[in-house]
Amino acid sequence: MPTVLCRLPNHVGDCCMCLPALRLLAASGFTPALVGKRWAEDLMAGMGGRFDPIEGKVTEDLSRIRYLAQNANTSEGLLFPNSFGSALLFKLGRLKTTGLKTDMRSFILDNGIPEPGTMHEVKRFFYVAHEAIKSWGATPAFDKVPERLSLVLMKRHEAAAKNLIEQYKIPARFALLAPIARGKHQGKVKHWEHFNELVAPLRDIGIEPIVFPSLR
């Protein structure tokens, strides 16, 4: 099966929302080889495929992408991020690059995919993979976005979660709150401003809020 070097997004939630798109690639006869932030390697470990980190250091990242283009049996690159920089890195890395026509990068894409209308990010990533497969002359294995993300956990992930639950005496009913999105999107603040207001109502119905703030 031909290998496609897939550039993952830079955030945990977005990486998870790529999973149906990656499953579509695999089901359609392609082998996804993943490239992304180093922390994503552990997140995607359950997929069992190749992962190579990029760290935001231009010369090192470019050397790694060129090495992969020459030695990982791949000439195709698929971009899930919208950024100009992600497209430029793959292009300079000598990959045939496919991605959305965003961030004024159309001229460096080998296969530019028209932007879809407003949709959930899961559907947007799925659309990217679906259109890419067709641009490569293949037929997508399915056209409907799966209902579940289906993140595959390793035994060590489950053990680590169990240890945290025991260490911090987390009750059986809990909700994870992750107020980490920053910046603006289309002129609007991305982060939800009401996490503090959500804590008390959750506790009132017997659900303990567990907050995972950003480290940065």
Predicted regions and their residues:
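Catalytic machinery of carbohydrate-active enzymes
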Residues: 1-216
